[in-house]
Regions:
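N-terminal anchoring/stem segment of glycosyltransferases
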Residues: 1-102, 109, 113, 123-126
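GT-A fold catalytic core of metal-dependent nucleotide-sugar glycosyltransferases
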Residues: 115-133
C-alpha cells in the first residue's frame, strides 16, 4: 500500500486566520491513515488529534534559525530591491510584473520555513510521498 504524509507550516499570527481551520479540515476530511505534520514556531497549538503531529520547526532545524538571523537585515532576502554590501543580489531581469519592485514573492526569509520543513520531512518521515499544503 502506498503511504502519504501531508506537511504544512504557519506562523503563530496566522493560527486564527487560517491555520486552525486548515488543521480541522484535515481531521474532518482526510483519510485516517494520512497524518498531517504541522511545523510551527513559538507555542504549540492546542488542537490535538491523532491525525496531527506538531513539529517545532526551529528546534528541529537550527540551520533555519541561523539563516533567518543571517538574513534578517538584508532587504533583498526580505523581498525588497535595495542591496547592501555582502547581501543577496537579485537579477534585475528577474520577475515579470514585479521587476524592479519589492514583493513578498521574493521574500526568502519569510518563505524559508517551507523549504526547511520539506527538507526535514523528506529526511525523517517514512512514507512513499510527502505532500505540501
Amino acid at each position: 500500500m502506498t503511504t502519504l504524509a501531508v506537511i504544512t507550516t504557519f506562523p503563530p499570527n496566522r493560527w486564527q486566520a487560517y491555520a486552525k481551520r486548515m488543521l480541522e479540515s484535515h481531521v474532518k476530511f482526510w483519510p485516517n491513515n494520512v497524518k498531517l505534520y504541522a511545523y510551527y514556531e513559538g507555542t504549540q497549538p492546542d488542537l490535538v488529534h491523532e491525525k496531527i503531529q506538531y513539529i517545532n520547526i526551529e528546534k528541529v532545524n537550527p540551520e533555519l534559525v541561523k539563516f533567518k538571523n543571517r538574513r534578517k537585515n538584508d532587504p533583498v532576502a526580505n523581498g525588497e530591491v535595495q542591496e547592501i554590501p555582502g547581501g543577496v543580489r537579485r537579477d534585475p531581469k528577474a520577475g515579470k510584473n514585479d521587476r524592479g519592485k519589492g514583493s513578498y514573492l521574493w521574500d526568502a526569509v519569510r518563505f524559508s520555513h517551507k523549504t526547511f520543513a520539506v527538507d526535514h520531512a523528506l529526511k525523517t518521515i517514512n512514507v512513499d510521498y510527502v505532500l505540501w499544503l
